[in-house]
Amino acid sequence: MTNIRKQHPLAKMINHSFIDLPAPSNISSWWNFGSLLGLCLMIQIITGLFLAMHYTSDTSTAFSSVTHICRDVNYGWTIRYLHANGASMFFICLFMHIGRGLYYGSFTFLETWNIGVILLFTVMATAFMGYVLPWGQMSFWGATVITNLLSAIPYMGTGLVEWIWGGFSVDKATLTRFFAFHFILPFIIAALAMIHLLFLHETGSNNPSGISSDSDKIPFHPYYTIKDLLGVIFLLLCLFSLVLFSPDLLGDPDNFTPANPLNTPPHIKPEWYFLFAYAILRSIPNKLGGVLALVFSILILTLIPFLHTAKQRSMMFRPLSQCLYWMLVADLLTLTWIGGQPVENPFIAIGQTASIIYFLIILILMPLTNLLENKLLKW
C-alpha cells in the first residue's frame, strides 16, 4: 500500500515541499535561514496574538496596557519580550538570508528574489507599526518623524500624511489603524512566504558553487530537517538568552516614558534594524532627496540581478568580488552605528561618506569587478 503522504492531496503537497524535496547535497548552514525566518514568523504571530488579547489601542490606555501585560498577566513579560526581541532575531535572520543570496548569486532566480524584496518591505512596515504600539516617547516621535517623510512627495504629500494620521497629528486614529495593520500584515507575510517558496521550488535551490546540482540531489528529509533543527536550537538559545538575561538591551530607554506630544526626545531614532536606512536618509540635507535615497537603499536589491555581469554565479571563486562584498557589509555596519549617533560632526561626514560608498559599491564597483574577473579568468 502506498504511503498516505504520497496519496492524500494535502499530505502530498507537504511531502513534495519538505520531505521528498530534492535538495543539493552541498548546501551549507547559510541555507538554514529560510526555515529560521519561518520559525521567527510563527513565534511573532503566536506571541502577538496573546499580546493582542490584553492590549488596548487607545492613546490614553495603550502605555498602561503594556505595563499591565508585563506586571499582571501570567508570563506576560515573557510574551512581550519574546515578541520584541523576536523581531530583532527576525531581522538578523533576514539580513543573513539576503547576504547569503547576494554572496552565492541566488538573485538570478528573479521571481523568488523579487518576492523576497516585497517581503522585506512588508516586514519593515510591520515592524515599524509594531514599534508605535507601546505608545512610549520614541514610539510617538518615531511615528511622527517617519510618517512625516511622506510630506516630501510633491503636490499630494501633506494630504497623504494627514490621511495616514487620520487627523492633523499622530493621535488615537493613527494608533488604532496601526494596530489593525500590524495585526493583519503577518498573515500577508505568511502568504507571500508561501509564494516565495512556490517560486523557489520551481527552479530548485541554489548551492555554494553556483553550478547546477541536478546530477547530485538528496532528499530534504532527514538530512536537512536535522540540519535545520540545529539552527532552530541555536536561534531559540540566542532568543531566550536575550529575553531572560537582558530583554531591554536592544530597546530605547525613552520608550519607558509615556508619549508626550509637548516634549521632544533629544535624539529620535528607530529600532536598530532600521538604523542603516535612517543614516542614509539623514545624510542628504534635502528632504525629498533623503526620502528617495531611503527607499532606493532597499529597492536597489531589485537591480542586483541586472547589474550581475560575472560569468560565474557564486562569489565562492571570485576573491575580488569577495573583498567588495565584505566592504559592503562593513559599510552597512558603519551606517547602522551612525544612525544611532546624534546629528553632529564627525558623524554627519562619516554618514555621508558611508552612504556614497554603499551606492558606489553596488551600482559601479561590483559590475566593473565582475567584468575584470571575467577578463582575468579568460571567460
Swiss-Prot record:
InterPro entries: Cyt_b/b6_C (IPR005798), Cyt_b/b6_C_sf (IPR036150), Cyt_b/b6_N (IPR005797), Cytb/b6-like_sf (IPR027387), Cytochrome_b (IPR030689), Cytochrome_b_C_euk/bac (IPR048260), Cytochrome_b_N_euk/bac (IPR048259), Di-haem_cyt_TM (IPR016174)
TM region positions: 33-53, 77-98, 113-133, 178-198, 226-246, 288-308, 320-340, 347-367
Binding note for cofactor: Binds 2 heme b groups non-covalently.
GO CC entries: mitochondrial inner membrane; respiratory chain complex III
Subcellular location: Mitochondrion inner membrane
Single GO molecular function: ubiquinol-cytochrome-c reductase activity
Residues reported in the UniProt entry to bind a ubiquinone: H201
Needed cofactors: heme b
Keywords, ordered alphabetically: Electron transport, Heme, Iron, Membrane, Metal-binding, Mitochondrion, Mitochondrion inner membrane, Respiratory chain, Transmembrane, Transmembrane helix, Transport, Ubiquinone
Superkingdom of the source species: Eukaryota
GO BP terms in the entry: mitochondrial electron transport, ubiquinol to cytochrome c
PROSITE patterns tied to this protein: CYTB_CTER, CYTB_NTER
Membrane topology type: Multi-pass membrane protein
Binding locations of heme b b566: H97, H196
Record function comment: Component of the ubiquinol-cytochrome c reductase complex (complex III or cytochrome b-c1 complex) that is part of the mitochondrial respiratory chain. The b-c1 complex mediates electron transfer from ubiquinol to cytochrome c. Contributes to the generation of a proton gradient across the mitochondrial membrane that is then used for ATP synthesis.
Family of the protein in this entry: Belongs to the cytochrome b family.
Subunit structure: The cytochrome bc1 complex contains 11 subunits: 3 respiratory subunits (MT-CYB, CYC1 and UQCRFS1), 2 core proteins (UQCRC1 and UQCRC2) and 6 low-molecular weight proteins (UQCRH/QCR6, UQCRB/QCR7, UQCRQ/QCR8, UQCR10/QCR9, UQCR11/QCR10 and a cleavage product of UQCRFS1). This cytochrome bc1 complex then forms a dimer.
Protein name, UniProt field: Cytochrome b
Taxonomic lineage: Eukaryota, Metazoa, Chordata, Craniata, Vertebrata
